[in-house]
Amino acid sequence: MTYEMPKLPYANNALEPVISQQTIDYHYGKHLQTYVNNLNSLVPGTEYEGKTVEAIVASAPDGAIFNNAGQVLNHTLYFLQFAPKPAKNEPAGKLGEAIKRDFGSFENFKKEFNAASVGLFGSGWAWLSVDKDGKLHITKEPNGSNPVRAGLKPLLGFDVWEHAYYLDYQNRRADHVNKLWEIIDWDVVEKRL
């Protein structure tokens, strides 16, 4: 199995001004491509050969294979959750109902998710995930980790590695996080539920 780059459903400049073309060019075109290339060179001849990225993340111990598989999975989910002009500015349907049930309101959820994103020390990810019973969880994952490792299904992820925002927001992580809400494609996120 060869791991491949996800195809972006938008042009590299389509998310401006939230995410600049320069950031997409580096973040997607260079960082993610490097993780994909690394994974393709690390996996052959190992017990992970032929496994999906999700299966590798769920079972691999810490190390190069896990780190690169985690970042391929994380970035694929991340880049595919955006749209230049999303149809909705908050989730509806089953996801909207689950957010209200588990967080009280969409605004409460955003507050908690922003706090997790901004409060993560160092590099990593904030995730909204669902467990096998349908309950939603917000988690902070360090480095290349993903909620799949804990048996959760990731729905929405914010990348808070500095490479995700430094060209556009410098050290203002909170500004980056607050702007991302403007480009979330809630239809894509809900389909992951």
From Swiss-Prot:
Domain of life: Bacteria
Sorted UniProt keywords: Iron, Metal-binding, Oxidoreductase
Oligomeric form and interacting partners: Homodimer.
Annotated source species: Bacteroides fragilis (strain YCH46)
Signal peptide limits: none
Name of this protein: Superoxide dismutase [Fe]
A cellular component term, taken from the record's GO annotations: cytoplasm
Family stated for the protein in its record: Belongs to the iron/manganese superoxide dismutase family.
Entry binding sites for Fe cation: 27, 75, 159, 163
Assigned EC number: 1.15.1.1
Necessary cofactors: Fe cation
Recorded catalytic activity of this chain's protein: 2 superoxide + 2 H(+) = H2O2 + O2
MF terms in GO: metal ion binding; superoxide dismutase activity
SS bond list: none
